[in-house]
């Protein structure tokens, strides 16, 4: 389901109760992103459960060579680093990294604590290790120096800000870059109804209920419009 389809569903619900109100698509998207994150945390934070691929997003990252991980001592070898910072990932799911060019080696995503201990075993020479550092970039290392020829990767994860990640999505196979509204919104079908409900509820705000200031038991309340 695309951003546009979800926006339409929200606005269609709101027409039932508020014909004279105006809601911008940008604000609806902001709330969709906000409550998507809330619903995914609520559903998956405390249980070990398979998360559907529809909750994940893939972003494209260009890589550059650097002498060390920011904040870590220089070890004399080279690293690859994403050219741009990576959007914040949620603490659910299993991030995955894939090469996007000729390199056929395996890329293994690991914690940043493990990063300092890997990449020294010649028997695992074809494995590239990858981790997100505190500075927000992805770093890559390997025993095999050929990994330095890797130029671009796809990073697949569940991101906190779906809009930010969507703006870094890979182009279509024909090179087309879709507008945000035409892209798939990353949420499983089962969570669409509660997502729409939460967004509509916030946009409606508190329901207006006129008060009987005189408390005289007469049917003389003003019309609520």
UniProtKB/Swiss-Prot annotation:
One Gene Ontology CC term in the entry: virion component
Top-level taxon in the UniProt lineage: Viruses
Keyword rRNA processing: no
Location in the cell: Virion
The keyword Cell cycle belongs to this UniProt entry's keyword annotation: no
Cystine crosslinks: none
Keywords: Virion
Other comment: The barrel is composed of five stacked dodecameric ring structures. Podoviridae-like phages usually possess only one such ring. The tail is thus rather long.
Function description: Forms the tail multi-ring barrel with ring protein 1, ring protein 3 and ring protein 4.
Quaternary structure, from the entry: Homododecamer.
Name of this chain's protein: Ring protein 2
């Amino acid at each position: 389901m695309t951003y546009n389809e979800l926006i339409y569903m929200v606005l269609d619900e709101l027409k039932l109760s508020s014909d004279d109100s105006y809601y911008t698509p940008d604000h609806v998207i902001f709330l969709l992103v906000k409550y998507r994150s809330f619903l995914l945390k609520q559903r998956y934070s405390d249980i070990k459960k398979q998360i559907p691929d529809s909750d994940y997003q893939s972003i494209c990252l260009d890589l550059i060579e650097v002498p060390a991980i920011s904040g870590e001592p220089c070890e004399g070898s080279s690293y690859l680093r994403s050219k741009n910072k990576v959007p914040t990932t949620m603490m659910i799911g299993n991030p995955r990294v894939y090469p996007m060019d000729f390199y056929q080696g395996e890329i293994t995503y690991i914690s940043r604590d493990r990063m300092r201990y890997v990449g020294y075993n010649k028997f695992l020479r074809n494995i590239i290790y990858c981790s997100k550092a505190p500075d927000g970039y992805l770093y890559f290392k390997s025993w095999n120096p050929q990994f330095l020829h890797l130029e671009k990767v796809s990073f697949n994860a569940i991101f906190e800000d779906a809009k930010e990640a969507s703006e870094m999505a890979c182009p279509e196979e024909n090179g087309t870059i879709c507008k945000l509204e035409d892209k798939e919104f990353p949420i499983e079908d089962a969570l669409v109804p509660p997502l729409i409900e939460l967004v509509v509820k916030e946009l409606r705000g508190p329901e207006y209920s006129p008060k009987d200031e005189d408390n005289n038991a007469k049917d003389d309340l003003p019309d609520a419009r």
